[in-house]
Amino acid sequence: MKKYLLVLFMISALICHAQQKTVTEKDVLLAMDKTASDLLKNSKANSVSIGIVKEGKTYTNHYGEIDKGKGNTANNNTVFEIASITKLFTGLLVTQAVLEKKISLDDDIRKYITGTYPNLEYQGTPITIRDLVSFKTAFNKDLPDTAELRKNFNDTSYLAFKKLAESYSREKFFADLKNIQLDTLPGTKFKYSNGSIQLTAHILENVYQKSYETLLKEKIFNKLGLNATQLNVSKDVIIANGYNAKNILMPKLSDNLWGAAGYLKSSLGDLVKFITFELDTKNKIVAESQRNLYNSNTSWNGYFWDYIMVDNNGQNCRKHGGAFSTQNMMIVYPERKLGISVIVNISDKNTSEELEKAIINLSTALLPKSDLPKEIYGYKVQNDNVVFTYKHDKGLNSDLVKSVNVAGSFEGWNPRDKNYLMIKKDQATYELSVPKSRFEKDKTHLFKFVINSTGWAEAPENATNKENGGDNNLILKI
């Protein structure tokens, strides 16, 4: 009997494996080359660096040149400003403090701030550490306050931003912190704030009685072997040049506070080590840093991620970093053992959009492809009803799926439409039966499945009712 069950299990495993097309090393390298070619053209960057960690194997490559006409192609040791990727490192320090029980997520942040701040509460409700790491402090402004500078943003605005950063001291920071007002209940509204990250560094210094820079070295850099990653670089370290869209050499960032929001410099060689760490789902620090701290039914932020969501490839975490001269983006799919970092040495108003497009396209090329038979996918017509069916990959954590919706041209592409909320049939299957009369006959209707209201599922490669080009929507016809 045991032997029979073992054979049955092996057959089942083989069938499940057969439903996924293998992405070869050649596929990875070709996808990197295509992504770089497109990104060099679309972003107008001189240089593109791509790092990939896939199922434990690392791939890196560098394209173009740092300075136009000089032929100085980047390499794995080239040091770049990584800007807001720094926030992930700050988040990891808080994660360790929580796991070491030095702080609690539900602690009032004022417990760890030097001085008295009666203003850091809203109608008696204080800001907690949980609110702080989730960008939900309810601060009514950033520190320093850059609202006026952003109103009249132009090609030379960076000069004003740099001047402000150079003159903004810790003394000024704490004076301004006393004037912060909370505009809503902490923990209820996402609001990106660099000042809250700088405050986090101060809290960490008080908790550990060590400098933020020392904590980075002891708790992250040394443990992960990040030899090129530094907060305050040595005089002999050359930081890669970067440019704006007019190919004007741009200055490096300045920071007289703690540097916790965006002052780190690193290399692609170090960033792929960092990605390898972030893909280790068995590591308690990693698991906690990516955790859904509010049990959100949609997306969440873990510890200072831009956002973490669930789609048909499971959980994925994203972070963007933008300096005056460079931008970079990182994405990790822990359940798929895939992580990517892309760096460009240009920073302009369209750069982040091109970066995101590039990294999503690259991810799509590298993620497993369903090897299902060529057939209509996602729906069937039964009598007077259209029955939609979504099946989540059984190799992924189905507990992360809180809801699945059908969103389409027939209901305004609303991923939260309760009339198109699917019913869970088993651990991985969702169905929805809709009267056929809702769909105009002989008309092309487009749709997608959306997980947790935010994760738009990609159509299987072999779906015969998939759009060619565009958003690769699924097609429904009555």
State where each predicted segment sits.
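N-terminal leader/targeting segments and the immediately adjacent pre-domain N-terminus
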Residues: 14-77, 96-103, 133-140, 175, ...
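Sec-dependent N-terminal signal peptides
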Residues: 4-12
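Short active-site loop at a secondary-structure junction
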Residues: 31, 38-49, 69-131, 184-195, ...
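Catalytic loop of the DD-peptidase/beta-lactamase superfamily, centered on the K-T-G motif
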Residues: 20-64, 111, 217-218, 222, ...
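Aromatic-rich carbohydrate-binding modules that target alpha-glucans
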Residues: 385-441, 452-477
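Short, surface-exposed loop or secondary-structure junction motifs
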Residues: 121-324, 329
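Extracellular Ig-like/FN3 beta-sandwich strand-entry sites
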Residues: 85, 442-444
